[in-house]
């Protein structure tokens, strides 16, 4: 089996276990046996909006208009091939982790991540669904928007992102989810106001 790891950083020889600054996961090396899935990690982002169909097919569903293009067009990075090993399988399809360092056996420079995704789609390895598809089913769209509202609001609240509105993470939510950002921060600011009795 081939194991992949993607990074915006070139020249790596060994992957050291690290703790994600964005996700609550243990210190580990994350790998995938699916090249198309690895491409998502060419950039560092606050969310990765991919999933799997019941049939096990990888897909990306734009959570906001032109999300894939906006996040990945013109972005480059390295796709690493890692040594074979007895890696632990996670609950996420095609994902494996290692608590130990992992040696790199090969590397491929990806000039444009968005173009690489289009090639993977043409090869039948991923389904890329644009925002219009996401919004075409009113019932599913409402459920997904409600889920995004809840998840992003909790993230803004728990990590206190709203207290640093000029941070990169705050800008990401302000730009891509303006309604959720406004509604959440308005609620939080109201809660912070002193009550006069």
Model-predicted segments: where are they?
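Short, surface-exposed beta-edge/turn micro-motifs
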Residues: 1-2, 25-29, 35, 75-78
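Short, well-structured hydrophobic secondary-structure segments
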Residues: 29-50
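Short, flexible beta-strand-to-coil junctions
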Residues: 5-11, 33, 82-87
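A general structural signal for short secondary-structure junctions and capping/turn motifs
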Residues: 21-22, 29, 68-72
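Conserved NAD+-utilizing ADP-ribose enzyme module
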Residues: 44-197
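ADP-ribose/NAD+-binding catalytic cleft of ART/PARP-like enzymes
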Residues: 1-26, 41-44
């Amino acid at each position: 089996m081939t194991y992949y790891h993607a990074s915006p950083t070139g020249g790596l020889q060994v992957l050291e276990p690290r703790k994600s600054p964005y996700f609550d996961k243990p210190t580990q090396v994350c790998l995938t046996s699916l090249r198309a899935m690895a491409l998502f990690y060419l950039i560092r982002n606050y969310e990765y909006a991919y999933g799997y169909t019941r049939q096990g097919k990888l897909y990306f569903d734009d959570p906001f208009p032109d999300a894939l293009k906006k996040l990945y067009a013109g972005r480059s990075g390295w796709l690493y091939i890692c040594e074979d090993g007895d890696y632990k399988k996670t609950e996420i399809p095609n994902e494996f982790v290692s608590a130990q360092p992992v040696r790199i056996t090969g590397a491929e420079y990806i000039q444009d991540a968005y173009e690489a995704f289009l090639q993977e789609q043409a090869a039948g390895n991923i389904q890329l669904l644009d925002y219009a598809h996401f919004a075409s089913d009113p019932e599913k769209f409402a459920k997904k928007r409600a889920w995004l509202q809840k998840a992003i609001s909790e993230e803004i609240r728990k990590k206190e992102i709203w207290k640093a509105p000029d941070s990169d993470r705050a800008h990401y939510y302000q730009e891509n989810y303006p309604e959720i950002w406004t509604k959440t921060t308005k609620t939080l600011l109201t809660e912070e106001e002193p009550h006069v009795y």
